[in-house]
Amino acid sequence: MPNYNAQNPLYSIFPGDVALAFNNEAPGAGQASQQFALPSYAGFPENGRAIRWQISFATAPTAVSIQLQTAINDVDAQYALPTGAANMSSTLTAGDNSVATGVRANFVRAKVVSITGGSGVTVHILG
């Protein structure tokens, strides 16, 4: 279930933009962040885009699983890990800095699948 109300229109992430999916927050297991639109533009390659994302913690958890989920339509049930994309999840308790590749979607969000201990979850998504 997302943490945030649906907003119309959604925030969009263009190349070079930084979006805060979680900003020093305490999401529980199963909580999703606000969603962001990934606009299409002329000349966009068919092999998908790359999305850089970074995870950090104020206090490191003992165990964690965070996913970068995408969807074609902005419907909670459609958000999932995309087939064929790489670097879409992290279990590193010290934080992570990844580049998700092969992403073909219109919307993106972060989801805390599980977390034990720790505090101050921050997830940056870079367009």
Task: Please state what every model-predicted region is.
Residues 5, 10, 25-26, 108, ...:
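Residue-level detector of intrinsically disordered/flexible regions characterized by low predicted structural confidence
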Residues 1-19, 122-127:
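Short, intrinsically disordered N-terminal pre-domain segments
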Residues 14-21, 51, 55, 110, ...:
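Short beta-strand element of the conserved SAM-dependent methyltransferase core
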Residues 18-46, 57-67, 84-98, 115-120:
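Surface-exposed ligand/attachment interfaces on beta-rich extracellular proteins
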